[in-house]
């Protein structure tokens, strides 16, 4: 599939892939309403609120978590965390190679997205409301959704990106060309799930949701699965500028399996430094390419990998107040004897918060 893509690049187009960060999903944070009472004659029927049932289940899981208290502690309070965050995301794409005797080199990127958000986390589940000034002003028209769950044993990252801002330079034997924003539409879904083996002493939530506090340094091996899929399609703007450019649709999907390692380094009693990497080897490919309405056979790459990296710095002023920054990166490498393709998606975040 990507060999066909390079052919297309040399004509005037190319694609980018993946991913990155920000919102959590949870039940709406309502007050702890106890029960609704309904009178029917002499009968009193008590209807327990849905939120209380959910809250009780979350509380049982949160307060009864089996962390080693010498390494990980639960802050005092009800398990509610509020944060103010600034987020920025970006996506770059690089490709070079020779296909059918035609050499090309491509450097593309989507527009950076900067948002400000207010986030709430309740006993491990959270939600965030983000504001994007550039989108309000009409400068940024891309769409991006990020869902994250960080648990004691299992964690999950999901991101979806729809971008029309892909732009950059294409160099090759046929001359240098420019892909302008709006000439192609990229849609990409990324999903990463991973299991933490040393889940009693190593805490992802301590680094990324701050719902726990790492007291002593600890690391853990990780087992993970990743999925990357989506499509790239040329737009009418490209045809208007280059009437001879082909109409191309590329659909792709990759599933990878792998393992990695994460480490939480505690400095003093207030600083936490986190680093982790989870490489996965692609074990399944589903690629499809349509050129001017005709299906083309997609070729497999000989070496496919998807890397997932995370960094975090957290400073706990006390059990209640904290601040920090995180960086999440997703990198893809696709390689055969003629073509090398590399994609990098990243999300940076700075935050300050309080625990209740």
Each model region followed by its residue ranges:
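Outer-membrane pore/translocation modules
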Residues: 71, 76, 146-251
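Extracellular/periplasm-exposed beta-strand and loop segments of Gram-negative cell-envelope proteins
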Residues: 105-117, 167-171, 177-189, 230-254, ...
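Repeated loop/turn-to-beta-strand initiation elements of outer-membrane beta-barrel proteins
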Residues: 124-130, 153-157, 199-202, 271, ...
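Residue-level signature of outer-membrane beta-barrel architecture
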Residues: 120-122, 131, 149-151, 195-197, ...
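Transmembrane beta-barrel strands of outer-membrane/channel proteins
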Residues: 82-90, 120, 129-133, 149, ...
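Surface-exposed strand-loop-strand hairpins of Gram-negative outer-membrane beta-barrel proteins
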Residues: 90-115, 126-137
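Cleavable N-terminal export/targeting peptides
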Residues: 1-73
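Outer-membrane beta-barrel "beta-signal"
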Residues: 190-193, 344-356
């Amino acid at each position: 599939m990507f060999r066909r893509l390079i052919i297309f690049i040399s004509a005037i187009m190319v694609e980018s892939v993946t991913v990155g960060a920000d919102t959590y999903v949870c039940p709406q944070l309502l007050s702890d309403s106890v029960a609704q009472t309904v009178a029917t004659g002499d009968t009193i029927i008590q209807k327990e609120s849905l939120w209380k049932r959910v809250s009780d289940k979350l509380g049982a899981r949160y307060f009864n978590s089996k962390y080693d208290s010498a390494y990980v502690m639960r802050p005092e309070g009800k398990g509610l965390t509020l944060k103010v965050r600034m987020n920025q995301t970006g996506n770059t794409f690089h490709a070079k190679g020779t296909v059918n005797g035609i050499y090309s080199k491509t450097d593309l990127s989507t527009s950076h997205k900067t948002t400000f958000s207010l986030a709430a986390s309740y006993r491990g589940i959270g939600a965030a409301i983000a504001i994007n000034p550039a989108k309000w002003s009409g400068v940024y028209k891309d769409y991006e959704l990020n869902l994250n769950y960080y648990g004691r044993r299992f964690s999950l990252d999901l991101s979806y990106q729809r971008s029309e801002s892909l732009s950059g330079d294409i160099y090759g034997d046929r001359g240098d060309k420019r892909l302008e924003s709006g000439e192609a539409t990229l849609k990409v879904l990324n999903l990463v799930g991973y299991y933490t083996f040393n889940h009693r002493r190593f805490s992802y939530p301590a680094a990324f949701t701050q719902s726990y506090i790492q007291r002593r340094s600890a690391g853990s091996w990780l087992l993970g699965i990743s999925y990357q899929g989506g499509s790239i399609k040329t737009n009418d703007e490209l045809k208007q500028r280059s009437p001879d450019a082909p109409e191309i649709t590329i659909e792709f999907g990759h599933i990878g399996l792998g393992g990695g390692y994460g480490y939480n380094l505690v400095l003093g009693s207030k600083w936490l430094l986190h680093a982790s990497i989870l490489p996965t080897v692609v074990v399944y490919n589903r690629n499809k390419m349509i050129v001017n309405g005709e299906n083309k056979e997609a070729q497999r790459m000989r070496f496919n990998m998807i890397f997932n990296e995370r960094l975090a710095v957290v400073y706990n002023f006390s059990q209640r107040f904290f601040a920090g920054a995180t960086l999440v990166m997703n990198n893809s490498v696709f390689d055969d004897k003629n073509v090398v393709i590399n994609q990098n998606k990243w999300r940076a975040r700075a935050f300050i918060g309080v625990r209740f």
